């Protein structure tokens, strides 16, 4: 009991001697929390504003890319697909998207969606390399979502169009590793297809059979198995 009293006295004396210091520390902590909350609020508003802007741009792009469209999102007449007026409007949309994607953070809906819209525009133009790069950036921004699988898959398609089969194979593999991505069998089939394009028959056969073992009831797996059989019948060559 005596020791407890001594302890209480020591604490009281410490608080009395260092009261100003403790008050200063408390004020600093509260001020820091207030500043953090303020910064968080500002960032949240900026993200919401960027998301709304990207959504508006995406709607304008949807109107602009319609094959039978003769009127732009702003109501002005435009030339046919590929015309200078259409391209100029696409360039304007790209500039706005780049502004939305140039924020200090590199994740979240606004960044990923902006990069995906950039990729879609370049994909429509068949500018495969630029589209591929933008899809990869979109996948990074959406890395916590299954949507990343979609973006990696699209990036792989761009690499495939460019004849960059090794890049395409790697990107298809990335898409297949994304959790909850619904097109995993199709992505894995394309891994085998890229191995075939690279002339690696054994690797292609292995990829197709692994696909079949993982998803035996899937249509892509059945097609993969038939490709593996065709390679085997062809003596290690694609048929």
From Swiss-Prot:
Q: Which UniProt keywords apply?
A: Cell membrane, Membrane, Repeat, TPR repeat, Transmembrane, Transmembrane helix
Listed under GO cellular component are: plasma membrane
What top-level branch of life does the organism fall under? Bacteria
TPR repeat ranges, renumbered to this chain: 112-145, 149-182
- State the InterPro entries in the record: TPR-like_helical_dom_sf
Subcellular location per UniProt equals: Cell membrane
Q: Where are the transmembrane segments?
A: 21-43
Keyword Phosphoprotein included in the entry's annotation: no
Q: How does it sit in the membrane?
A: Single-pass membrane protein
The protein here is known as TPR repeat-containing protein TP_0282
What species is this protein from?
A: Treponema pallidum (strain Nichols)
């Amino acid at each position: 009991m005596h020791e407890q009293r001594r302890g209480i006295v020591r604490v009281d004396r410490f608080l009395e001697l260092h009261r100003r210091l403790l008050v200063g520390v408390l004020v600093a902590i509260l001020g820091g929390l207030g500043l953090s909350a303020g910064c968080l609020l500002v960032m949240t508003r900026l993200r919401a504003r960027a998301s709304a802007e990207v959504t508006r741009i995406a709607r304008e792009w949807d109107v602009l890319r319609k094959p039978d469209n003769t009127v732009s999102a702003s109501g002005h007449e435009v030339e046919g697909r590929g015309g200078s007026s259409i391209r100029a409007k696409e360039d304007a949309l790209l500039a706005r998207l780049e502004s939305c994607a140039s924020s200090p953070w590199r994740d979240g809906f606004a960044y990923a969606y902006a990069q995906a819209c950039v990729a879609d525009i370049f994909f429509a133009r068949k500018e495969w390399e630029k589209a591929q790069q933008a899809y990869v950036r979109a996948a990074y921004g959406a890395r916590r979502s299954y949507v990343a699988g979609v973006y990696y898959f699209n990036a792989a398609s761009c690499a495939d169009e460019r004849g960059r089969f090794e890049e395409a194979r790697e990107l298809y593999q990335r898409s297949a590793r994304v959790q909850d991505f619904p097109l995993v069998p199709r992505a894995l089939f394309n891994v085998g297809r890229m191995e075939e394009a690279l002339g690696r028959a054994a690797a292609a056969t292995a990829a197709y059979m692994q696909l079949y073992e993982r998803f035996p009831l899937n249509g892509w797996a059945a097609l993969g198995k038939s490709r593996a059989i065709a390679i085997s019948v062809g003596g290690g060559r694609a048929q």
